[in-house]
């Protein structure tokens, strides 16, 4: 059983018992106290102090009167503070040193200080034995004197484990779980009842702030959605206006062409009636062919389904005429005539919108590939006819080779684009 007094006090008590009583052999009692013979033997051999901190003393007079605790197996004395016991109330009924039972000790060292241990053995504090011994033994002058405290502030802090310190700090709300950049470094005193009310107020404020943030985010999202809806509505309106603009363009083009044809007829008029008849016939045929082409294109667009039909192109107002570009924008594109000759025709390109869709691009690429295929077939037929008839000059084949190479490069680029952006 661990002793609650110093070795010097126990030696004095043993000497007084020797004078009053004769040595009698008594068996080992169940509460862990030794017999008088064993006490005489231990007193004759001397007490041994072997602590975790590394101090080994065999002289009893070297003790400073602090708290000591004895191992129940090897009867070695150790410093109570070095083993993790600051008061006598914390001492268990049964104690074993770190050599007899190392599993009960958790030895640690802080910096360059002495080693210390934390006793992990389970036991109840010996309050009853303390009261009995205090009532049986009179207070000695050594106990009346103030005991020398060997522990400094650093060693006292080191006696506490870091995990225990964190647990105590959390219990006393020194480390708030949710803090917005503000830390409270107050004393370790227990929190006052006002702290709970303050904590509830802080939690309420945090909840209110979070709700306000959510409301602001929702409002921003709704504004973004409204702006997107406005943009889509404006694009739809522009698309609906586009067919009207195209119809106006076609009417103006027809009027210009008629005026141009009339001027040509008036300028090229001759006294010969045969020439006038030929000119008028040519103009009528050109008009009829143009009308037929337009009607065929309109029928093709009507026959196409809604998903495949091309979307009307968007045009912008330039000057006073809607969607009408200048004459400089017209381009001359060579087309193959059935007779085998290339004829340049004036075409007006449609301006591509900056926000064209991928489906429109795919449709245009497909139409371009189809057109290039027709051109390649016609060029192959033309080259075969020329070779069979007569030998052409050197310039002709070179030009054809150049055009064929350009067509091949264009088809290669279009196929590469189609493979990259095709639907998966």
Swiss-Prot record:
SMART domains: PHD. The modification Phosphoserine is found at residue 187. It is found in: Cytoplasm; Nucleus. A zinc finger (PHD-type) spans 48-103. PROSITE patterns: ZF_PHD_1 (PS01359). The keyword Cell membrane does not apply. Pfam families: PHD_5. Residues 127-137, 272-287 have a biased composition (Low complexity). Residues 257-266, 294-303, 392-405 have a biased composition (Basic and acidic residues). Residues 1-49, 117-155, 170-341, 381-405 are annotated as: Disordered. Residues 241-256 have a biased composition (Acidic residues). GO terms for molecular function: methylated histone binding; zinc ion binding. Keywords: Chromatin regulator, Cytoplasm, Metal-binding, Nucleus, Phosphoprotein, Zinc, Zinc-finger. GO terms for cellular component: cytoplasm; nucleus; Rpd3L complex; Rpd3L-Expanded complex. One of its GO terms (biological process) is negative regulation of rDNA heterochromatin formation. Residues 313-324 have a biased composition (Basic residues). Could be a component of the RPD3C(L) histone deacetylase complex (HDAC). This is Putative histone deacetylase complex subunit cti6. It comes from Schizosaccharomyces pombe (strain 972 / ATCC 24843) (Fission yeast). The lineage of its organism: Eukaryota, Fungi, Dikarya, Ascomycota, Taphrinomycotina. The gene is cti6.
């Amino acid at each position: 059983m661990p002793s609650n007094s110093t070795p010097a006090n126990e030696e004095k008590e043993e000497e007084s018992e020797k004078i009053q009583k004769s040595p009698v052999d008594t068996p080992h009692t169940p509460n862990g106290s030794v017999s008088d013979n064993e006490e005489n033997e231990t007193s004759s051999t001397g007490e041994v102090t072997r602590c975790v901190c590394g101090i080994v003393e065999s002289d009893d007079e070297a003790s400073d009167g602090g708290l000591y605790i004895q191992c129940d197996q090897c009867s070695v004395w150790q410093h109570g503070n070095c083993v993790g016991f600051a008061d006598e109330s914390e001492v268990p009924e049964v104690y074993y040193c770190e050599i007899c039972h190392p599993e009960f000790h958790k030895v640690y060292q802080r910096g360059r200080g002495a080693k210390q241990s934390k006793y992990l053995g389970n036991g109840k504090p010996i309050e009853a034995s303390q009261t009995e011994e205090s009532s049986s033994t009179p207070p000695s002058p050594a106990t009346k004197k103030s005991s020398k405290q060997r522990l400094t502030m650093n060693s006292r802090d080191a006696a506490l484990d870091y995990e225990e310190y964190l647990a105590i700090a959390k219990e006393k709300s020194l480390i708030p779980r949710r803090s917005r950049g503000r830390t409270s470094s107050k004393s370790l005193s227990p929190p006052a009842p006002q702290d709970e009310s303050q904590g509830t107020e802080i939690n309420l404020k945090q909840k209110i702030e979070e709700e306000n943030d959510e409301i602001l985010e929702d409002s921003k999202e709704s504004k973004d959605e409204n702006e997107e809806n406005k943009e889509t509505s404006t694009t739809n309106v522009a698309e609906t206006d586009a067919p009207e603009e195209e119809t106006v363009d076609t009417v103006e083009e027809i009027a210009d062409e008629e005026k141009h044809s009339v001027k040509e007829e008036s300028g090229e008029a001759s006294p010969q009636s045969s020439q006038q008849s030929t000119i008028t016939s040519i103009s009528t045929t050109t008009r009829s062919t143009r009308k037929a082409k337009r009607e065929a294109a309109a029928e093709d667009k009507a026959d196409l389904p809604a998903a495949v039909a091309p979307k009307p192109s968007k045009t912008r107002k330039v000057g006073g005429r809607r969607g009408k570009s200048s004459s400089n924008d017209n381009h001359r594109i060579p087309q193959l005539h059935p007779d085998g000759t290339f004829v340049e025709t004036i075409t007006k390109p449609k301006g591509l919108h900056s926000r064209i869709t991928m489906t429109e691009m795919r449709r245009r690429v497909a139409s371009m590939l189809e057109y290039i295929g027709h051109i390649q077939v016609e060029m192959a037929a033309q080259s075969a006819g020329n070779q069979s008839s007569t030998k052409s000059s050197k310039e002709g084949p070179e030009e054809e080779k150049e055009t064929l190479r350009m067509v091949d490069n264009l088809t290669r680029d279009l196929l590469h684009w189609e493979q990259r952006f095709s639907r998966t």
